[in-house]
UniProtKB/Swiss-Prot annotation:
This is GTP 3',8-cyclase. Belongs to the radical SAM superfamily. MoaA family. Its cofactor is [4Fe-4S] cluster. Binds 2 [4Fe-4S] clusters. Binds 1 [4Fe-4S] cluster coordinated with 3 cysteines and an exchangeable S-adenosyl-L-methionine and 1 [4Fe-4S] cluster coordinated with 3 cysteines and the GTP-derived substrate. S-adenosyl-L-methionine binds at Y39, G80, S131, M202. GO terms for biological process: Mo-molybdopterin cofactor biosynthetic process. The lineage of its organism: Bacteria, Pseudomonadati, Pseudomonadota, Gammaproteobacteria, Pasteurellales.
Length: 337
């Protein structure tokens, strides 16, 4: 495990050595997921032999409080499937009440949306990303291992009914599986305020063969969009890495997340904390910096902030995916993608 010294670093902002400032925290609250997606957990969630508890509500409050004190404005709750936690609403309420936090976002597989999305909104979830890898129910089942396509679609409609003005939908782009649905997805968002985001398949330790078989560059879609009159939109400082395209004839938008693109890391603005309390500087990076020993008491906040800053000074300028190095990540379920 990486050892980070505790010292008075003389700063209260999350700024790395390349002058990138980190406004955005992706916080995994569980590794557990009830879907069996082919590109992530094809055999379903397998509990580790040495069971370690996920972050408690108090630990979550302390870690997000430290990030907020150092300039973080947006927190995204990920997993696993974050809504599987029994205290999910309490987590949202706690984070949204912290000083400095302006947005609490959620990434979900959507299986509970129809029933629970109104409660999520009241608790403080300001935006939702839903994973939908196919608009064909049979293909959806083939990719996710769950026959819940119609349930997820109803959940998205319910979110609009109760007041969400925009929903983001994530689809992992896979050659010969769902890339042929691009026009179908595009037509789906023509009259709906949906930002349809296509994410390039990413290489991880357990999925090398899958990656080699199904990876498709998002640049192909970017060129297609530009030819059809779509316009690249400017980013806000808390936005994620997606390149977002809009079109005057479409209510919805198209986003492309292309981690293999040159300069992908230049505008990095997010850090990640795993469900077991490790800080990860990069999705494709190191083993992680353990924070849990500094989440025991509220009196540890200053030391916790010092460790966060010290760790951040070791963040690389960019990942090494182009060299075939995806770090130690065996899959994306434990860190929320």
């Amino acid at each position: 495990m990486q050892s980070i010294p505790i010292k008075n670093v003389g700063t209260n902002r999350l700024v790395d050595t390349f002058q990138r400032e980190y406004y955005y925290l992706r916080l995994s609250v569980t590794d557990v997921c009830n879907f069996k997606c082919t590109y992530c957990l094809p055999s379903g969630y397998q509990p580790p032999v040495q069971k370690e508890s996920f972050l408690s509500l108090d630990e979550i409050r302390r870690i997000v409080g430290a990030f907020a004190a150092m300039g973080t404005e947006k927190v995204r709750l990920t997993g696993g499937e974050p809504t599987l936690r029994k205290d999910f609403l309490a987590i949202v309420e706690t984070i949204s009440a912290l000083e400095g936090i302006k947005k609490v976002a959620l990434t979900t597989n959507g299986y509970r949306m129809e029933k629970d999305v109104e409660r999520w909104k009241k608790a403080g979830v300001s935006s939702i990303n839903v994973s939908v890898d196919s608009l064909d129910p049979r293909q959806f089942y083939s990719i996710t291992g769950e026959n819940k396509f119609h349930q997820v679609m109803k959940g998205i409609e319910r979110a609009f009914e109760i007041g969400y003005e925009k929903i983001k939908v994530n689809s992992v782009l896979m050659k010969n599986l769902n890339d042929q649905e691009f026009d179908r997805f595009k037509n789906w968002v023509k009259d709906k305020p949906i930002q349809m985001r296509f994410i390039e398949l990413m290489q991880t330790g357990e999925m090398d063969q899958f990656f080699n078989r199904y990876h498709l560059s998002g640049q192909i879609l970017a060129e297609k969009l530009l030819k059809e009159g779509w316009i690249l939109r400017q980013k806000d400082r808390t936005d994620g890495p997606a390149k977002v395209f809009s079109h005057p004839d479409y209510l919805g938008e198209i986003g492309l997340i292309m981690p293999y693109e040159k300069n992908f890391c230049a505008s990095c603005n997010r850090l990640r904390v795993s469900a077991k309390g490790k800080l990860h500087l990069c999705l494709f990076g190191e083993e992680g910096v353990d924070l849990r020993d500094l989440l025991v008491s509220d009196e540890q906040q200053v030391i916790l902030q010092s460790r966060l800053y010290a760790a951040l000074q070791g963040k690389r300028e960019h990942h090494l995916l182009a060299q075939g190095n995806s770090g130690i990540r065996t899959n994306l379920a434990s860190i929320g993608g």
